[in-house]
């Protein structure tokens, strides 16, 4: 099985394949998938790396694959009032909901309970299948948010 072990910063060479993956899979550092023709592949990357649409991975044999964000069930929030959208971000963030924030609204993985909450704030919520590319988060370039493996403690202002 072809195994992809590194992310390429050099996008000069055209990828040999593409791999369409939902966000849940793109968060994992180790997984199996398959190309559209059914060829099985493996991905083994450093922990904590989230694959983004357009990333290119390379195998030890030099084969390259372009990652694509697969369409998946998402809730699409639309509104013209920036304050209402900010309130929705606040309430969804308090629930640790992963969000895609665009110029004209928000997207999150579909959840009817969250949809009802957001509608209660006065926003319009629709359902669609679309690529989901959420915000990387405040700690994207730093250390992992978990506490396993290090000996000191620090407060975050919220419970885990």
Curated annotation (Swiss-Prot):
Top-level division of the source organism's lineage: Bacteria
CDD domains: UreE (cd00571)
Region ranges (Disordered): 1-20, 138-160
DNA-binding recorded as keyword: no
Compositional bias of kind Basic and acidic residues: 1-16
Entries under Pfam families matching the protein: UreE_C, UreE_N
Cell compartments where the protein resides: Cytoplasm
Compositionally biased intervals (Basic residues): 144-160
Keyword match Cytoplasm: yes
Coiled coil (residue ranges): none
UniProt main location, coarse: cytoplasm
One function term, GO molecular function aspect: nickel cation binding
Keyword entries, A-Z: Chaperone, Cytoplasm, Nickel
A Gene Ontology cellular-component term: cytoplasm
GO process annotations (BP): protein folding; protein-containing complex assembly; urea metabolic process
SUPFAM superfamilies membership: Urease metallochaperone UreE, C-terminal domain, Urease metallochaperone UreE, N-terminal domain
Family of this protein: Belongs to the UreE family.
Described purpose of this protein according to its UniProt entry: Involved in urease metallocenter assembly. Binds nickel. Probably functions as a nickel donor during metallocenter assembly.
Name listed for the protein in its UniProt record: Urease accessory protein UreE
Organism expressing this protein natively: Thioalkalivibrio sulfidiphilus (strain HL-EbGR7)
Gene expressing this chain: ureE
């Amino acid at each position: 099985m072809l195994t992809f072990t590194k992310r390429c910063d050099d996008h000069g060479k055209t990828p040999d394949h593409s791999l369409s993956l939902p966000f849940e899979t793109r968060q994992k550092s180790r997984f199996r998938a398959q190309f559209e023709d059914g060829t099985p592949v493996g991905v083994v990357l450093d922990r904590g790396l989230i694959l983004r649409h357009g990333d290119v991975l390379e195998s030890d044999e030099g084969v390259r694959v372009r990652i694509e964000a697969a369409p998946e069930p998402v809730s699409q929030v639309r509104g013209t009032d920036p304050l209402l959208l900010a309130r929705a971000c606040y309430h969804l963030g308090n629930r640790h909901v992963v969000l895609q924030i665009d110029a004209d609204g928000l997207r999150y993985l579909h959840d009817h309970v969250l949809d009802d909450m957001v509608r209660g704030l006065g926003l319009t919520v629709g359902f669609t299948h679309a690529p989901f590319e959420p915000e990387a988060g405040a700690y994207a370039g730093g250390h992992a948010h978990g506490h396993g493996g290090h000996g000191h403690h620090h407060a975050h202002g919220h419970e885990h």
